[in-house]
């Protein structure tokens, strides 16, 4: 099972990350807010989705278009 990891860096604002989670992964606002809180202060990032590699690859491309740092682990 593949994993998509969000790396929280100071370049991105919380509203930008929340908007990306909603756009790229169809998150609801409360879930997006919870992920942002979890990601704060974690150097390794936080897993935002697990599943099919192709689905996560497409989501990662969406995040890259928005200049948000993610990592896909196959």
Stretch-by-stretch model annotation:
Residues 1-74:
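Terminal domain-initiation and capping elements
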């Amino acid at each position: 099972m593949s994993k998509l990891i969000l790396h929280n860096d100071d370049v991105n604002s919380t509203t930008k990350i929340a908007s990306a989670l909603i756009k790229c992964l169809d998150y609801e606002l409360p879930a997006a807010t919870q992920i942002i809180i979890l990601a704060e202060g974690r150097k390794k990032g936080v897993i935002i989705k697990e599943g099919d590699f192709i689905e996560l690859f497409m989501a990662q491309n969406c995040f890259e278009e928005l200049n948000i740092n993610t990592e896909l682990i196959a």
